Amino acid sequence: MSVIPPLHRPLQQFFRSGPMPCPYLTGRVERKLFTRLVGTDNGEINSQLSRVGFRRSHDILYRPVCPGCSACVPVRVPVAAFQPGRTMRRIQRVNQDLSFRLIPAEATMEQFRLFAAYQDARHNDSDMNRMTPGDYAAMVDEGQADTMLLEARDEGGRLRGAMLVDRLDDGYSAVYSFYDPDQPRRSLGTQLVLALIEQSRLQGRPYIYLGYWIEGSRKMEYKAKFQPLEALGRDGWAPLAQAAD
């Protein structure tokens, strides 16, 4: 007689959203498969689902399941193989005066002021530009799954950029970044990813999960600059050109 072992935790429930206009490709329809992070196993669940293409927002893990479309391709950087190109090395030289550190994720007014300035300059027509300090705190605090904040500060101690990151069992997931919009020469969005890659290299963590690469979307296409880049396709993770067919 076989014995079914007891469940160590409740089964994870998944749901599918209704159709919405795609925020990345004009004329497309977006639907998502999603689940909530609740309980004490958030870090483990986040790690497992990140490996199969899910992303986190607040206490929700989601991935696109859009009808007739597979444009959103999950991508990650294999840290040991990554080598910055000439443009990225120039960005690193420009930012030599910045220091970077990973700290426990805790919302502050200093962060919110920078976040609000970034939204106003870069995304002034988005819902995020209407976020209050309480909304920002919820973004940082809800669904914590071993979540940290990568800070970039100049020599005077001023916060120039920040990235909300989740520590996974095989690396880091870059959740959201924001930075000083009055410093375009620094290319701080790219620099924050480079700094996270270096933190992972020092810690021996193999991957940086960057979310979705979307060909034809200016907001998402930039991720292909980080080479080599792996993408999740039908047969698992593979170099982007092979997996994004």
Task: Report each predicted region and the residues it spans.
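Residue-level preference for non-acidic, small/hydrophobic
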Residues: 49, 115, 193-196, 223
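Conserved acetyl-CoA-binding loop-helix of GNAT-fold acetyltransferases
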Residues: 185-197
